């Protein structure tokens, strides 16, 4: 028994900040950002627009796309590292917004790898037979964690949310396989310099960019190779590669090393920037809206995030 995606939806805040606009208050310029990241703009949530609001917008689109009633949902998992509050969870608040009662809801925190982690967790819960319809969300207000004086990090991130509706598959479609990993010894490569039990503040993002690039290439590539080998797949079997949208150089290098053809690689980082756990479901929603995905297509997701956390998943559409 495995789960399948029956609907998806994405949401980006209406405010768009281009590289040129960013350069007005940050020591940077459009050429510097484009060359190093491939990003031209990012969406930024308003002061009173929280992660739960972004999650709600994407969830409603996914529910409509799936053609189900909101009351069909029997579990909510929100993957986020930027909750509205220390507690309760974003998932709990979202449950209230949707008018649902007496169903479980919880947040999952694996940063940029959150959606892949969440997919494996959701699949296990559906496979148990205990849950029939799961709302899985990646939602982030990453700009709330940015130091706008640090041009090495503030240019990279944006806000947004992506949701999928998961149900048990009754044919050969759905999650084929996935793997997830972590390495706590490497946490100082990417972290926030604050936290509730540390100093009572959320802190700002601190990143060792060159080290993170090397780890991303090494770990995502190995994760994908392991999945290919375990399922007796070849790279040519992949119809679409949807990697975490962190940086165009990481995406391009991975595709090159794995020999994945350019037209199969989904890239949204240019317009979305890095939306952390939301980046893969947002990219999936963009691809689905294009009408390109066909039944039976093999989709490959792969991500790496702070922790370090990483993993990959194969889906048959």
From Swiss-Prot:
Homodimer. Catalyzes the condensation reaction of fatty acid synthesis by the addition to an acyl acceptor of two carbons from malonyl-ACP. Catalyzes the first condensation reaction which initiates fatty acid synthesis and may therefore play a role in governing the total rate of fatty acid production. Possesses both acetoacetyl-ACP synthase and acetyl transacylase activities. Its substrate specificity determines the biosynthesis of branched-chain and/or straight-chain of fatty acids. InterPro entries: ACP_syn_III_C, ACP_syn_III_N, FabH, Thiolase-like. Keywords: Acyltransferase, Cytoplasm, Fatty acid biosynthesis, Fatty acid metabolism, Lipid biosynthesis, Lipid metabolism, Multifunctional enzyme, Transferase. Belongs to the thiolase-like superfamily. FabH family. Its EC number is 2.3.1.180. The lineage of its organism: Bacteria, Pseudomonadati, Pseudomonadota, Alphaproteobacteria, Rickettsiales. Pathway: Lipid metabolism; fatty acid biosynthesis. It is found in: Cytoplasm. Residues 245-249 are annotated as: ACP-binding. The keyword Aminoacyl-tRNA synthetase does not apply. The last Arg residue of the ACP-binding site is essential for the weak association between ACP/AcpP and FabH. It catalyses: malonyl-[ACP] + acetyl-CoA + H(+) = 3-oxobutanoyl-[ACP] + CO2 + CoA. GO terms for biological process: fatty acid biosynthetic process; secondary metabolite biosynthetic process. The active site is at 112, 244, 274. HAMAP family: FabH. This is Beta-ketoacyl-[acyl-carrier-protein] synthase III. It comes from Rickettsia massiliae (strain Mtu5). It is an enzyme of class 2 (transferase).
């Amino acid at each position: 028994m495995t789960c399948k995606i029956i609907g998806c939806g994405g949401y980006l805040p209406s405010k768009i900040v281009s590289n040129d606009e960013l350069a007005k208050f940050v020591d940077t310029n459009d050429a510097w950002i484009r060359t190093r990241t491939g990003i031209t703009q990012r969406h930024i949530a308003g002061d009173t627009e929280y992660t739960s609001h972004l999650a709600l917008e994407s969830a409603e689109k996914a529910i409509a796309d799936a053609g189900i009633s909101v009351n069909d949902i029997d579990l909510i998992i929100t993957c986020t590292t930027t909750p509205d509050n220390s507690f309760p969870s974003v998932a709990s608040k979202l449950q209230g917004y949707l008018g649902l009662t007496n169903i479980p809801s919880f947040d999952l925190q694996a940063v940029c790898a959150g959606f892949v982690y969440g997919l494996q967790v959701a699949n296990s819960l559906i496979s148990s037979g205990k849950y029939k319809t799961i709302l899985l969300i990646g939602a982030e207000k990453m700009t709330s964690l940015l130091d706008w004086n640090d041009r090495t990090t503030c240019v990279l991130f944006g806000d947004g949310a992506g949701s999928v509706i998961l149900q048990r598959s009754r044919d050969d479609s759905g999650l084929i396989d996935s793997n997830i990993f972590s390495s706590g010894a490497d946490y100082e490569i990417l972290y926030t310099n604050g936290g509730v039990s540390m100093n009572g503040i959320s802190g700002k993002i601190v990143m060792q960019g060159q080290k993170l690039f090397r780890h991303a290439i090494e770990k995502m590539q190995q994760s994908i190779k392991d999945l290919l080998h375990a399922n007796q797949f070849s790279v040519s079997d992949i119809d679409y590669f949807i990697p975490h949208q962190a940086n165009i150089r990481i995406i391009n290098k991975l595709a090159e090393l794995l020999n994945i053809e350019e037209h199969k690689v989904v890239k949204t980082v240019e317009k979305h920037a890095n939306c952390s756990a939301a980046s893969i479901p947002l990219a999936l929603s963009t691809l689905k809206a294009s009408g390109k995905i066909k039944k039976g297509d093999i989709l490959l997701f792969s991500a790496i995030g702070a922790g370090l956390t990483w993993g990959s998943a194969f889906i048959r559409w």
